[in-house]
Amino acid sequence: MQRHMLKSKIHRAAVTHCELHYEGSCAIDEDLLEAANLVENERIDIWNINNGERFSTYAIKGERGSGMISLNGSAARRAQLGDLVIIAAFAMVDEAELQAGWKPKLVFIDEGNKIKGHRDHVPTQNWT
């Protein structure tokens, strides 16, 4: 059996550009792509923390070190500059890979879209 698992996540990225008339996609700083194990043309889901919008597109490379998160084409209508988004990708993982310790790449960034930390799991949520 295979399971559809979280593979990559960039958490709380600030939208830096919205380019309505650019070919559709999401340009992501190449440093963030690599840290999250995302590749160019990979399908990504984007969840807008500010307005609740959830949509899919594909990743393209943004200038390395720029902090760029550019929503392009129709995706530009789903956010405003400065909105915080979560960018995620999923993968089909078989039971053997899971048993061998397969883990996602979770990237946490600061206000300037620079990497401030990594994790390989989401902590248990508590009621405290």
Swiss-Prot record:
Pathway: Cofactor biosynthesis; (R)-pantothenate biosynthesis; beta-alanine from L-aspartate: step 1/1. The modification Pyruvic acid (Ser) is found at residue 25. Binds 1 pyruvoyl group covalently per subunit. It comes from the Bacteria. The active site is at residues 25, 58. The keyword Transcription does not apply. It catalyses: L-aspartate + H(+) = beta-alanine + CO2. InterPro entries: Asp_de-COase-like_dom_sf, Asp_decarbox. GO terms for molecular function: aspartate 1-decarboxylase activity. It holds the Pfam family Asp_decarbox. Its EC number is 4.1.1.11. GO terms for biological process: alanine biosynthetic process; pantothenate biosynthetic process. Is synthesized initially as an inactive proenzyme, which is activated by self-cleavage at a specific serine bond to produce a beta-subunit with a hydroxyl group at its C-terminus and an alpha-subunit with a pyruvoyl group at its N-terminus. It is found in: Cytoplasm. Its cofactor is pyruvate. Signal peptide: none annotated. Heterooctamer of four alpha and four beta subunits. Catalyzes the pyruvoyl-dependent decarboxylation of aspartate to produce beta-alanine. HAMAP family: PanD. Belongs to the PanD family. This is Aspartate 1-decarboxylase. It comes from Burkholderia ambifaria (strain ATCC BAA-244 / DSM 16087 / CCUG 44356 / LMG 19182 / AMMD). The gene is panD.
